[in-house]
Amino acid sequence: MVVLAASIISKSGKALVSRQFVDMSRIRIDGLLAAFPKLVGSGKQHTYVETENVRYVYQPIEALYLLLITNKQSNILEDLDTLRLLSKLIPEYAPSLDEEGVCKAAFELLFAFIEAISLGNKENVTVAQVKQYCEMESHEEKLHKLVMQSKINETKDVMRRKVTEIEKSKTDRGKPDKGGFGSLRTPNSFSDMGIRGGGPGGDPIFGDMDSFTHKAKGRPSAPAPASASTKVPGGMKLSKAQKTNQFLESLKAEGEVILEDTQPSATQSRSSYIPPSDPITVTIEEKLNVTVKRDGGVSNFDIQGTLALQILNDTDGFIQLQIENQDVPGLNFKTHPNINKELFNSQQIVGAKDPNRPFPSGQNETPLVKWRIQELNESSLPLAVNCWPSVSGNETYVNIEYEASEMFDLHNVVISIPLPALREAPGVRQIDGEWRYDSRNSVLEWSIILVDQSNRSGSLEFTVPAADPSTFFPISVGFSASNTFSDLKVTAIRPLREGSPPKFSQRNRLVTYNYQVV
């Protein structure tokens, strides 16, 4: 008995996994596998088929064929026994009995074939033995990994305790109030928002509504200036943390892979934060939630906007904002409960119900107005993406094009196309922009840094092995822009007390929250 090759192929003859047990060129094995589907008659129940030189012993597995190529002198009964063994091994390693599942487990299947067949002859093994041989677990290796992992965990615990002590000491130093703003909170919605304490000349305009807000951990809103120069109690304890760092470096030098916690500490967050240069900053942001049908039409087009205010100095909190916006169909505003709604609806002025209470100050933004737009159609999309996959022979040709609206200049555009499981990157034939293949998630990312008047449209063309057209959906799109649909802006800031209007800056941005073609 001589098994020339053991293979898994599709019904069209596409080779997914193949292991040769004799010297055979790539061209010859490709020719033998491609010729097999033509030899198998439809409706026949045979388990083998012969040609002048070789014999095919096969077994259908859903939409695939498990195939043994042998010489004509081999024992057909032993060939069938080998085929049965391999058919039991495939479900043990492949997550699903289709092209994608087999390709994902290609190497595991090859190793299993090698354990089951040696030099073209079947080994006297069972499925359980093959699995054991492929795993090749080592008790010594497991013990070594457990010891090293325990050392790493112990080191991380020491580091966490030190970080906690440092953060606690910094928090204790920042407890003295400045102007009464003891706990600045980060609001997330209209229903309830709160900042406790009081500013000079009056109480803050926002009450304490705990269901809405959450405190910024370990971060005082306005620490006293003297605390900046205060020495950290027990600061010399950092030398112990330095020893733990040296221990981690020694582990890395021995080739150990150490997974550090990626969550930054509060100290790192504060050091990387760039404070605004102007005393008052207004941020206007709109988020897109769009679902476009691949055949045309929009199933969801939702825009949610927010106007947020950040004031650095307590004395600048007694102000009102004059705004204006474009008349957009379906635009609905909603103000914070402590904002004067009558003043906003009649004159488009954002001001507090009680003018004697200031807006809160600090490093956090306070949302004042929110809005929603829901009555736009497909013609208002900032970016339209069309995908045209077509199967030709053993390949799928995919053409993707985008068309951008004249209303927006889009920055950092990324179009992510899902692909079938591939051994190699797709063959990109033409592209306007850059591309990157994420092999881990099997996604092709098409990137354009800027879409403006010079490139309102563009295309991408690539090829992959034959696949179902639905494989390339849903397509995810991400981008940002410096103008918004509502075109809302603050035209002036009016002080409620004597003095000149404070200087302010304004930031407008349109971002994608969920933008897909399905």
Curated annotation (Swiss-Prot):
Location, primary (coarse class): cytoplasm
GO biological process entries: endoplasmic reticulum to Golgi vesicle-mediated transport; Golgi localization; protein transport; retrograde vesicle-mediated transport, Golgi to endoplasmic reticulum
Compartments, as annotated in UniProt: Cytoplasm; Golgi apparatus membrane; Cytoplasmic vesicle, COPI-coated vesicle membrane
Alphabetical list of InterPro entries matching this protein: AP2_Mu_C_sf, Coatomer_dsu, Longin-like_dom_sf, MHD
Residue span, MHD domain: 277-518
Region (Disordered): 165-235
Low complexity bias (residue ranges): 220-229
Organism superkingdom: Eukaryota
Topology in the lipid bilayer: Peripheral membrane protein
A GO CC term assigned to this protein in UniProt: Golgi membrane
Gene3D superfamilies documented for this protein: 3.30.450.60, Mu homology domain, subdomain B
Keywords, comma-separated and alphabetical: Cytoplasm, Cytoplasmic vesicle, ER-Golgi transport, Golgi apparatus, Membrane, Protein transport, Transport
SUPFAM superfamilies with a match to the protein in the record: Second domain of Mu2 adaptin subunit (ap50) of ap2 adaptor (SSF49447), SNARE-like (SSF64356)
Segments of skewed composition (Basic and acidic residues): 165-178
Purpose: The coatomer is a cytosolic protein complex that binds to dilysine motifs and reversibly associates with Golgi non-clathrin-coated vesicles, which further mediate biosynthetic protein transport from the ER, via the Golgi up to the trans Golgi network. Coatomer complex is required for budding from Golgi membranes, and is essential for the retrograde Golgi-to-ER transport of dilysine-tagged proteins.
Quaternary structure and partners: Oligomeric complex that consists of at least the alpha, beta, beta', gamma, delta, epsilon and zeta subunits.
Entry protein name: Coatomer subunit delta-3
Organism for this UniProt entry: Oryza sativa subsp. japonica (Rice)
Lineage: Eukaryota, Viridiplantae, Streptophyta, Embryophyta, Tracheophyta
